[in-house]
Design a protein with these regions (language model features):
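Conserved ABC transporter NBD signature motif
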Residues: 66-74, 81-82
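Catalytic Walker B motif of ABC-type/P-loop ATPase nucleotide-binding domains
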Residues: 162-165
Length: 279
């Protein structure tokens, strides 16, 4: 088995500007590795490039340049094998209201070419607590159940990697926590999870490693622990008219120093004191 579920090297995707003049990069020279068996968070605001990243991996968008390897398969050299290694759960609740969950999964399994004797539909329904609703019309399911049905459809061909695109966007806290439980359950059963989100709380709660994407570039990629430690340390610089006494107890505690341009720099923990209080 590969050490990395997904390995990305210098991946770029450019699109034409809406006015037809010139181009913009939705992804700009992105490189990252997603460890096998991890819950990996791709964090960023709307328009950061998260959906473009997913669409390239899923074969829905053609990259401009770079390399992407999914479960040991290069997406250019082995497109079918790489796509079959992925299950993608879209943000939109797209279900057929006239199909039951069991019928939906049977249909999805057929589309993936899974033979009837190899289908594990009852197991998936049971794992996602949809067994009692297996024969109910999908239109009668609650919002949380519909989300879980989308997860079930993505897992029907037993992919080793599951991508969840903004799975809790627009849902309440109770439903969000409920979905987190199922994500952990899937991961404990061996599935590598890739979670795109703009909720810092969600990434902090679930993920082992987090990459922050903004304007098509990776701003930071590190373990959750390293990112949280970075968040505990901030620096502020201000230009002062008069040189302060650096031996003052508060300035000593903040590790203050001053340069030749009379710029005073202090380090602080934003959980203890904020920049306004310092100023």
């Amino acid at each position: 088995l590969p050490d990395d579920a997904i390995s990305i090297h210098n991946l770029s995707k450019k699109f034409k500007n809406p006015d037809g003049k010139g181009f913009f990069y939705a992804l700009d020279n992105v490189s990252l590795s997603i460890p096998r068996g991890s819950i990996f968070g791709l964090l960023g605001p709307n328009g950061a490039g998260k959906s473009t990243f997913i669409n390239i991996l899923a074969g829905l968008t053609i990259k401009t340049s770079g390399e992407a390897v999914v479960w040991g398969n290069n997406i250019d050299q082995h497109p079918k094998a790489s796509r079959s290694s992925l299950g993608v759960v879209p943000q939109e609740l797209t279900i057929d209201p006239f199909f039951t969950p069991k019928e939906s999964l049977e249909q999805q399994a057929g589309l993936y070419g899974v033979r009837p004797k190899d289908r594990n539909i009852d197991y998936i329904l049971r794992m996602l607590d949809l067994e009692d609703k297996a024969e109910a019309y999908s239109r009668t399911l609650s919002g949380g159940m519909r989300r879980r049905l989308l997860v079930a459809k993505a897992m029907v061909h037993r992919p080793p990697i599951l991508i969840l695109d903004e799975p809790t966007a627009g849902v309440d806290i109770e439903l969000r926590v409920q979905l987190w439980k199922y994500v952990r359950k899937l991961n404990e059963n061996g599935t590598t999870i890739i979670l795109t989100t703009h909720y810092l709380e969600e990434a902090e709660e679930l993920c082992d490693k987090i990459a922050i994407l903004d304007k098509g570039k990776i701003v930071k990629s590190a373990s959750k622990q390293d990112l949280l430690e970075d968040a505990d340390s901030k620096t502020i610089s201000v230009k002062v008219r008069e040189t302060p006494d650096l031996n003052h107890p508060i300035l000593l505690e903040l590790g203050a120093n001053i340069n030749d341009n009379n710029e005073l720099t202090v380090n602080f923990n934003p959980k203890i004191i904020n920049s306004r209080e310092i100023l």
